[in-house]
């Protein structure tokens, strides 16, 4: 628990960051392409300093590159969650997630028993999210995390949403939980279950290293508990908590169905 005290500091900082953002998002001029990115970064550095980001985080910001691949992926988000829940589950390999999830539930029984006794969250939903997000850790992404999340904070579509996560990513760099070279998913998500940086600050447990399986799964349970998970109600009785994880209806329904199938074996 070398990071225990630091972890409490990170959580407190995360709560403050996530409450800040409406005004901060407007402090630097957003853009719709790479042309203004470097100028924006210089302005955003002042925003970051004001939020408490220190030298390592500011250095990571200075080194961030405009992430064209992230912008392309962001433009396609709605399409990825279109169609019926059945077609979505088929595209995402739900039957494989269920089969492997059942196997992992057995082979990691001690871990899932600990998670359930600590957080009240049943194994199925954790396994469903883990399988859906990264194929149980098989692919956690190759996009530079700082560049991705900073680009999204700069982009004019949703700066109010992504600015707190950009600040959080820089704070995580300051504290050593991320580095300027850390990689993850296209929208800056991190680790086995793909937390956005602000959620790492607020809900991550222990040393916040979400590339560690146990830390990631316990952090996921902590997130769900904080979003109203009701022990004993099962996944389908906890749609509100699942909605906190992902706002897409087809995703929520798929997770609930997969979780129920895993827990009901």
Cite the ranges covered by each PLM segment.
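Mature N-terminal segment immediately following signal peptide/propeptide cleavage
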Residues: 35-55
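Catalytic glycan-binding domains that act on GlcNAc-containing polysaccharides
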Residues: 53-265
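Cleavable N-terminal signal peptides
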Residues: 13-15, 25
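Bacterial N-terminal signal peptides that target proteins for export
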Residues: 1-13
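Cleaved targeting-peptide boundary
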Residues: 27-34
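Sec/Tat signal peptide C-region and signal peptidase I cleavage site
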Residues: 21-27
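Compositionally biased, low-structure terminal segments
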Residues: 4-5, 45, 89
């Amino acid at each position: 628990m070398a990071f225990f005290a630091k972890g409490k500091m990170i959580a407190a900082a995360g709560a403050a960051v996530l409450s800040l953002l409406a005004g901060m998002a407007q402090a630097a001029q957003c853009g719709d392409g790479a042309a203004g990115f470097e100028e924006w970064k210089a302005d955003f550095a002042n925003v970051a300093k004001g939020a408490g980001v220190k030298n390592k985080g500011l250095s990571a910001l200075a080194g961030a590159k405009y992430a064209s691949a992230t912008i392309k992926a962001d433009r396609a988000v709605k399409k990825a969650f279109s169609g019926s829940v059945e077609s979505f589950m088929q595209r995402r390999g739900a039957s494989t997630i269920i089969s492997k999830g059942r196997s992992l539930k057995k082979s990691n029984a001690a871990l899932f028993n600990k998670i359930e006794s600590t957080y009240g969250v049943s194994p199925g939903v954790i396994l469903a999210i883990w399988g859906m997000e990264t194929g149980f850790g098989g692919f956690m992404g190759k996009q530079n995390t700082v560049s991705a999340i900073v680009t999204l904070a700069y982009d004019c579509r949703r700066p109010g949403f992504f600015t707190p996560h950009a600040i959080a990513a820089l704070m995580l760099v300051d504290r050593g939980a991320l580095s300027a070279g850390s990689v993850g998913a296209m929208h800056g998500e991190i680790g086995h279950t793909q937390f956005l940086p602000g959620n790492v600050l607020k809900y991550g447990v222990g040393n916040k290293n979400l590339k560690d399986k146990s830390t990631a799964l316990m952090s996921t349970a902590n997130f769900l508990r904080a979003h109203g998970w009701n022990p004993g109600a099962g996944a389908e009785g906890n749609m509100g908590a699942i909605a906190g994880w992902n706002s897409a209806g087809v995703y929520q329904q798929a997770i609930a169905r997969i979780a129920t199938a895993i827990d009901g074996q």
